[in-house]
Regions:
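Beta-propeller-forming repeat regions
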Residues: 1-166
Length: 166
């Protein structure tokens, strides 16, 4: 192996993840992103029904070095809380040459800060691409599992909802 690090943040107690229902604490996702526009970084995430976290690492001299960490904690007013997804994807959605991390209703910028959040709750599936060819930029199609449920088509650069159906 190249290098290993402890998973961050650690599991802790189940209730530290927003509720004690099911396996909320043990929901993970990961992706590779070009956060600086040229070198790959690994981004791991934990939680998406309530508390959501993401941690980015770079390889420096064959060691994993933390680039940034994002954590909503248990504060429902923090952008990203409860707005995760069962998967994640990396894409340069804002045209700055650096990839962002999209995980459901939340887009985390290359610096680990929230770029936008829909506040539509946790999602089950999403697709990103030039879905409207007559329109500049990328769009995100996302299905929402939480009330008010439904689907949204979103401008991936800024989180503006272009279409929503409950």
């Amino acid at each position: 192996a190249l290098d290993t690090v402890n998973y961050e943040p650690s599991r802790g107690t189940v209730s530290k993840w927003g509720d004690s229902y099911g396996n909320r604490v043990d929901r993970f996702w990961g992706t590779v992103a070009y956060l600086d526009g040229s070198k790959p970084s690994v981004v791991t995430g934990r939680g998406y029904y309530t508390r959501m976290t993401a941690t980015a690492y770079d390889v420096v001299n064959k060691k994993l070095v933390k680039r940034w960490a994002f954590d909503t904690g248990n504060d429902k007013s923090v952008a990203g809380y409860g707005d995760g997804n069962h998967n994640s994807m990396a894409a340069d959605v804002d045209g700055d040459g650096k990839q962002e991390i999209i995980t459901g209703s939340t887009c985390i910028d290359d610096n680990g800060k929230v770029l936008w959040c829909l506040n539509k709750g946790h999602g089950d599936a999403m697709h990103l691409g030039d879905l409207l060819p007559d329109r500049k930029g990328l769009e995100l199609w996302i299905c929402h599992e939480d009330k008010p449920y439904g689907v949204s088509l979103v401008d991936a650069s800024n989180g503006k909802i272009l279409f929503h159906k409950d």
